[in-house]
Every structure is written in C-alpha cells, then in structure tokens.
C-alpha cells in the first residue's frame, strides 16, 4: 500500500486527497487502512470517520433472496447498520501488509502499526539508518 505522495498517485486514489495538505493525505491514508482491516477481520463492520462512512446512511435492505438479520440491520426499519466483504482473506487476521516508505516518520508509523516496509533504492548507509528506525 502507499499513500501517494505525488499528484499523479494521490488524486487518482481518492478524490479527497489534496497535494497541498500532506497532513490531510496522511489522515486519509490511515483511515483507509483502518477500513480495510475492519473489512478483513470483522464478519460485519461499520465505520464513521473523517472521510468514510460505511454503510451509507439511511440505506434500506431490499434483497428479497437473502433474509434480513439483526447482525447487520435494524430489523424494525430495515436500515443497514453493518456491511461485510467476501471472501475474507485466508490469512489470519489478514494478509501481510506492506507499505512503501521513504522518510523516518513513515518508517516509524509502519513499524508501530505492524506493517512491513518496502524502501526505495537507498544507499547502503541510508538503508542501515532506516533499518535502525524500524
């Protein structure tokens, strides 16, 4: 996964990204990762954040072939309260996540959040320094 530090990447990944606001882009990336992990690890999930709301508010269950369930909707109103993603990953709790990193803050964040790292082609000296940070 990558945050998209260049315009050609960031703006095509999410319309909310802003090349002039890297702090916002970082929050967007972090929330995207949170949603992705929820989708992989929870049978049914919901999320309400700065950028995403799942499921969409006021969405009514209208699927006659599948019975409604209190696991994912309000049975009185038929409003969907949670959604699921299928198939779930085979790996538990989810596949290993690799993040492309370059700067010290990104390396530290990846390490603190249990992500593996992919580093651009640094010199051996720079690579040693990055490994120390991780």
Placement of each model-derived feature along the sequence:
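Internal, glycine-rich beta/alpha segment that forms the wall or movable "lid"
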Residues: 1-113
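Short low-complexity, flexible loop/linker segments enriched in glycine and/or proline
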Residues: 12, 129-134
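A conserved active-site cap/scaffold subdomain adjacent to cofactor or substrate pockets
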Residues: 102-131
């Amino acid at each position: 996964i990558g945050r998209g530090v260049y315009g050609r990447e960031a703006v095509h990944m999410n319309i909310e990204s802003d090349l002039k606001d890297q702090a916002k882009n970082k929050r967007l990336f972090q929330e995207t990762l949170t949603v992705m992990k929820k989708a992989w690890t929870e049978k049914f999930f919901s999320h309400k954040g700065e950028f995403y709301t799942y499921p969409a508010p006021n969405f009514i269950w209208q699927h006659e072939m599948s019975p409604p369930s209190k696991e994912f909707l309000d049975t009185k109103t038929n409003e969907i309260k949670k959604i699921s993603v299928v198939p779930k990953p085979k790996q538990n709790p989810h596949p290993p996540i690799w993040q492309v990193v370059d700067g010290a803050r990104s390396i530290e964040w990846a390490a603190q959040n249990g992500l593996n790292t992919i580093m651009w082609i640094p010199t051996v000296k720079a690579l040693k320094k990055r490994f120390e940070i991780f």
